[in-house]
């Protein structure tokens, strides 16, 4: 028997076993990754990714985008008693549009509050807005700017926006984090 035929037979076998055991394929949302223990990032979750999200036992979902949430996602959030926060955040675009520094500080305070963990932070594609916010978290963690930009570029691929990187670099707005609910991996006062 040829190796291609063997692989096809194995695939058929495992698919039939999964059906027999009533298992679903687990599909993470676009650009999903862990930022830090209890904090995840992604693009907009679709219904196929909901079983994956259930495994995370999310307490909070934060959506950062200037548009509305999809009804199927709102239903998922309500049906699973997940705390939902929607911040209408504009994208960083040259030459005059920039994320609001005060709003970013407010979002970071929510993301870093352990009472909200486990938490998913997402925008539509999980690239620009979330990438900028993650870059600001990395600054708070004391990462080097080159490491921050490297992480940003891993998620943005060819869609790098210099304005996002500039925003991360100049962000200095104070972020209030209650010391009682600060994550143990964040070493700031």
Sequence positions of predicted segments:
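Cys-dependent protein tyrosine phosphatase-like superfamily
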Residues: 1-121, 125, 132-189
């Amino acid at each position: 028997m040829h190796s291609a035929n063997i692989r096809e037979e194995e695939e058929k076998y495992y698919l039939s076993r999964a059906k027999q055991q009533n298992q679903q394929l687990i599909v993470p949302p676009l650009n999903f990754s862990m930022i830090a223990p209890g904090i995840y990032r992604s693009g907009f979750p679709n219904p196929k990714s909901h079983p994956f999200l259930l495994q995370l036992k999310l307490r909070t979902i934060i959506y950062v985008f200037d548009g509305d949430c999809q009804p199927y996602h709102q239903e998922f959030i309500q049906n699973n008693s997940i705390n939902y926060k929607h911040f209408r955040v504009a994208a960083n675009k040259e030459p005059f549009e920039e994320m609001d520094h005060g709003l970013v500080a407010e979002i970071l305070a929510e993301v870093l509050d352990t009472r909200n963990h486990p938490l998913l932070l997402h925008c539509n594609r999980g690239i620009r807005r979330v990438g900028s916010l993650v870059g600001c978290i990395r600054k708070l963690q004391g990462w080097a700017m080159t490491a921050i930009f490297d992480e940003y570029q891993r998620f943005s691929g060819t869609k790098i926006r210099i304005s996002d990187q500039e925003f991360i670099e100049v962000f200095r707005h104070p972020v209030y984090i209650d010391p009682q609910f600060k994550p143990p991996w964040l070493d700031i006062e």
